[in-house]
Amino acid sequence: MKSGGIRNYFLQYFIFIISAAASITMVAEDNVEYFKYGDFNSWITRQIPESRILGGKIKTLYEVGPTQTIEGAKAYKNLDGSPWATSNVYAKVVGISKGSCAVVPDTRSAGNKCAKLTTIMERCKAIGIINVDVVVAGSMFLGEMIEPVSSTDNPYSKMDMGIPFTKRPKALCFDYKLEIPVDGKHIYSSGFGKKKILPGQESAEVMVFLQRRWEDSSGRLYAKRVGTGRIRFDKSTKGWVNKYQLPIMYGDITKKTEYKPYMGLIPSERSYHARNSKGKIVPVEEVGWDNETATPTHIIVMVSAASGDAYTGTLGLTLRIDNVGTVY
């Protein structure tokens, strides 16, 4: 090969290497916008005195927000613009105060925390008055929990699900670590009636829905689904999975190969709830799929140590989550 040919060959090779490196850099430099407090390094500690009839102990609950301690049986409202709510609740039923905690901060490394979500059996016992066991799956979502909770009826009616959001991300990103107990049973226990062993294996779940919502003159809320991402994890991980991306598909996704039945529209009988313009918590009825170019008004993100109906789960199933954001 002549010297000129050699130079051209190496020049082309050099350009190829630079181009490949540039393409790799572009992938690595996805624009990620993290939700406020989405690194889970800052937590609020709540000290709830439970009723004497239940033993009168102090129950510790945690919320995601500015570091501080709140003492007393007080209804919690999100602080400092934190968009995060959890399944941790202060309940007051027929005058009896009780706390439940299935989401806690956990140390991931020195100076670095994450959220730890576990499915637990919450027991409430007062001799001669009450004796109930309730399966509680540790869950987190964008929105607000309405406290104090006064019953186990329709748990979604106690949750203001979703926050205003008008962007169109291509994915939800997060770090996660999952531990599923070997031979763990899938249990239903609502506190009423007998416990049941359900068929199948439980899994953890992460979902992101983009909705375009509107309100009618009577205060009813409706929505069309703009974007969908939903996944169920049914295998324990070998340590942390970092920078996982859950793709968001736009428009009607029912004909896509990636579609699974659990990604469908929310049935009206299981509608999530939100606060309308009158300040009332009402169902948000999903009435159809929106145009794939539509602009959303709200985003729903939920992370859970279970994927089934309320009051079901596998005790001990533990999902750790960290660094939650949207990818563009």
Please annotate each region the language model reported.
Residues 1-34:
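Bacterial Sec-dependent N-terminal signal peptides
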Residues 15, 19, 45, 177-179, ...:
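Residue-level marker of positions within ordered structural domains that often coincide
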Residues 161-166, 188-194:
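A contiguous catalytic/ligand-binding core that recognizes phosphate-bearing ligands
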Residues 178-185, 196-201, 310:
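Extended, low-complexity, turn-rich repeat/linker tracts enriched in Gly/Pro/Ser/Thr and Asp/Glu
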